[in-house]
Amino acid sequence: EGNTIYESDGQTGQSKILKYTLGETNATTFTAQPADVFSEGSTIVGNKVYQLTWQNKKGFIYDKSSLKLLSEFPYPNVMGEGWGLTYDGKNLIASDGTKNLYFLDVNDPSKMVKYISVAGNTEVYDQLNELEYYNGFVYANVWQKPIILKINPIYPLIF
């Protein structure tokens, strides 16, 4: 965002959320997670940063400026893991390593608004990983494949 880079750095026992100035290699600030957490996707919503954990079935909400932990939230029961996270201007959109994208209430991310299953003309894609929302589409990479999907979030087709 602007000249600031936010990074969700995952590794059990070493996970953290970091903030960098563009072009710099040292973080200006960071917040470490508990040792049992493997952090995954993150996204910015207003003055907050939302972050998922891989298998802990919870996410974190931070103050964007200080990266101070504001709160935690449990995943909706249908989400198995936390992989990627983005924001479409209304809802958080999360992936869990399956073919599904979960639309979560930004004011209460433990509540699922809806979910979609992603498919192309001839193939169903699973292991949806990192997510980005841009110009009305969700972009998702497929884990360990050189594929980036362009997904219509209203009619979950691939372009």
Language model: regions and residue ranges:
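Beta-rich, blade/repeat-based domains predominating
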Residues: 1-2, 35-46, 76-92, 122-136
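Conserved beta-strand positions in repeat-built beta-propeller and related beta-rich domains
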Residues: 1-12, 49-56, 92-98, 140-144
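Structural signal for beta-propeller blades
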Residues: 14-17, 58-59, 100-102, 146-148
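Short loop/turn segments that connect beta-strands within beta-propeller blades
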Residues: 20-25, 63-67, 106-109, 152-156
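A short beta-strand motif characteristic of beta-propeller blades
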Residues: 25-33, 68-75, 111-123
